[in-house]
Amino acid sequence: MKLTCVIIVVALFLTACHAKDKQEHPAVRGSDDMQDSEDLKLAKKCTVDSDFCDPDNHDCCSGRCIDEGGSGVCAIVPVLN
């Protein structure tokens, strides 16, 4: 029984030492991944031009929603050179 416990402890110790050398900066990489996923969740996407929008509360990329009797369409704004 004692031999089994010693073998298990040695195996765990060797496994932990081997895995410890695999990642140089695990905390830094983990926080960067977390930040990227939070940014994606918090990023607000706008409605593209010519898609339907709500005239009272629109989120058009162009910034303009043309009211067409209750429903609206995001305005297509030409780029002037």
From Swiss-Prot:
The presence of a 'disulfide through disulfide knot' structurally defines this protein as a knottin. The keyword RNA-binding does not apply. Residues 1-19 form the signal peptide. It comes from the Eukaryota. Disulfide bonds join 46-61, 53-65, 60-74. Expressed by the venom duct. It is found in: Secreted. Keywords: Cleavage on pair of basic residues, Disulfide bond, Knottin, Neurotoxin, Secreted, Signal, Toxin. InterPro entries: Conotoxin (IPR004214). It holds the Pfam family Conotoxin. Residues 20-43 form a propeptide. Belongs to the conotoxin O1 superfamily. GO terms for molecular function: ion channel inhibitor activity; toxin activity. The keyword Metal-binding does not apply. This is Conotoxin ArMKLT2-01. Its main location: secreted.
